[in-house]
């Protein structure tokens, strides 16, 4: 049994075509070439960046070229730092802590932890991200959003190793613990807040107040659950082939809870659809609460812009997962999906 794309429920209004602009790929490649990450004339390096960053068009379908560049800078950093931490320091606890501290220092202060030694390319990448965000905040007067953005990335840094360390246990990870870690580790909060930093339309509400609203927090958490599980489905075949499937729920639910593969698939689909239902309910609760607090119709419309950005992430993620070489197996197609239309609510 395969999961069909139509098994995942979405409101029809969430479905958007990818952004047609892709200049941001060349721009980010050139930016990071200056840092020393890539070789400018190396086609393999360029294809690697292209395969990573085409997700930007799916997650941010309504943004202009300048906004796409800002968001792509974040996504590129997220993917590279995640791979760097997992590949280079997966079993070296003391060095793990040192690496995390060095990147955290850059995010929080805009300064290197130890400038007396040679600065690593990965640290230069984090500094470039920090400076890019700060420059945007100055240009558009968004320092509150910039601060939330840096705090969110700081929290994400400390989520990478806890997930990896769950593989050290002789027992499979429990779904509740996995979900708790993935709420931060999947990077959805960063994807939302960088979109809000990039936004040029929200002018009449305080974004930070919406971000701190507990109902909006629950909306984001349900989004992370859904997006994380979709990515797990899309990447399972490749992870299994590479031996990286231990923390994938398609594997550990079978082992821990003695489920068949089909039962595991059904559980994941139901969990995803339940998350979507909860998001829709909470959106109405949030809008009603804000209206009762005196938000005008125009202000509520701007809150809806924020909610729509989240819809774009959810819907764009599953569409990108179908074609992503980051998740797909060797034949270019994730075994878990068939390319059919979404089932709308």
Swiss-Prot record:
Q: What induces it?
A: Expression is detectable but at low levels in vegetatively growing cells and increases during development induced by starvation. Expression is highest during the ultimate stage of mature fruiting body (approximately 24 hours after induction).
Which Pfam family, just one, is annotated for this protein?
A: Terpene_syn_C_2
What is the top-level taxon of the source organism? Answer: Eukaryota
Catalytic reaction annotation: (2E,6E)-farnesyl diphosphate = (3E,6E)-alpha-farnesene + diphosphate; (2E)-geranyl diphosphate = (E)-beta-ocimene + diphosphate; (2E)-geranyl diphosphate = (Z)-beta-ocimene + diphosphate
EC main group: lyase
Q: What is its EC number?
A: 4.2.3.-, 4.2.3.106, 4.2.3.46
| DDxx(x)D/E motif (motif): residue ranges | 82-87
What SUPFAM superfamilies does the entry give? Answer: Terpenoid synthases
Give the keywords, sorted: Lyase, Metal-binding
Which segments of the protein form a coiled coil according to its record?
Answer: none
What are the recorded GO MF terms, alphabetically? Answer: alpha-farnesene synthase activity; metal ion binding; terpene synthase activity
GO biological process per UniProt: sesquiterpene biosynthetic process
Motif NDxxSxxxD/E motif: where in chain? 231-239
Q: Which family does it belong to?
A: Belongs to the terpene synthase family.
According to the UniProt entry, the note on domains is: Contains several highly conserved motifs that are important for catalytic activity including the aspartate-rich 'DDxx(x)D/E' motif and the 'NDxxSxxxD/E' motif, both of which are involved in complexing metal ions to coordinate the binding of the isoprenyl diphosphate substrate in the active site.
**Its biological purpose:** Terpene synthase that converts its substrate farnesyl diphosphate (FPP) into the sesquiterpene (E,E)-alpha-farnesene. Is also able to convert geranyl diphosphate (GPP) into a mixture of monoterpenes including (Z)-beta-ocimene; (E)-beta-ocimene and allo-ocimene.
Protein name per Swiss-Prot or TrEMBL: Terpene synthase 1
Q: Which gene encodes it?
A: TPS1
């Amino acid at each position: 049994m395969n999961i069909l794309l139509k098994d995942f429920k979405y409101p029809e209004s969430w479905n958007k075509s990818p952004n047609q602009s892709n200049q941001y790929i060349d721009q980010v490649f050139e930016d990071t070439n200056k840092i020393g990450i890539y070789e400018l004339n190396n086609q393999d390096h360029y294809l690697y960046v292209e395969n990573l960053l085409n997700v930007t068009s799916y997650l941010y379908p309504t943004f202009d070229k300048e906004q796409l560049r800002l968001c792509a800078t974040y996504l590129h950093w997220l993917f590279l730092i995640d791979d760097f931490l997992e590949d280079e320091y997966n079993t070296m606890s003391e060095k793990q802590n040192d690496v995390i501290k060095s990147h955290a220092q850059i995010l929080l202060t805009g300064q290197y932890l130890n400038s007396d030694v040679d600065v690593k390319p990965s640290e230069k990448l984090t500094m470039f991200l920090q400076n890019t965000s700060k420059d945007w905040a100055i240009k558009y007067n968004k320092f509150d959003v910039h601060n939330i953005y840096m705090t969110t990335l700081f929290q994400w840094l400390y989520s990478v190793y806890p997930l990896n360390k769950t593989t050290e246990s002789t027992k499979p990870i429990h779904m509740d613990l996995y979900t708790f870690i993935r709420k931060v580790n999947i990077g959805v909060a960063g994807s939302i807040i960088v979109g809000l930093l990039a936004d040029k339309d929200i002018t009449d509400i305080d974004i930070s107040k919406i971000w701190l609203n507990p109902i909006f927090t629950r909306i984001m958490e349900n989004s992370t659950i859904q997006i994380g599980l979709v990515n797990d489905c899309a990447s399972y075949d490749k992870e299994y082939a590479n031996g990286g499937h231990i923390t994938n729920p398609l594997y550990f639910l079978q082992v821990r809870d003695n489920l068949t593969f089909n039962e595991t698939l059904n559980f994941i689909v139901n969990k995803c659809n339940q998350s979507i239902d909860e998001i829709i309910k909470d959106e109405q609760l949030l809008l009603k609460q804000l209206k009762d607090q005196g938000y005008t119709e125009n202000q509520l419309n701007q809150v809806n812009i924020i909610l729509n950005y989240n819809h774009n992430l959810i819907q764009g993620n599953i569409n990108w997962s179908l074609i992503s070489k980051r998740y797909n197996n060797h034949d270019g197609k994730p075994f878990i999906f068939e390319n059919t239309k979404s089932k709308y609510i």
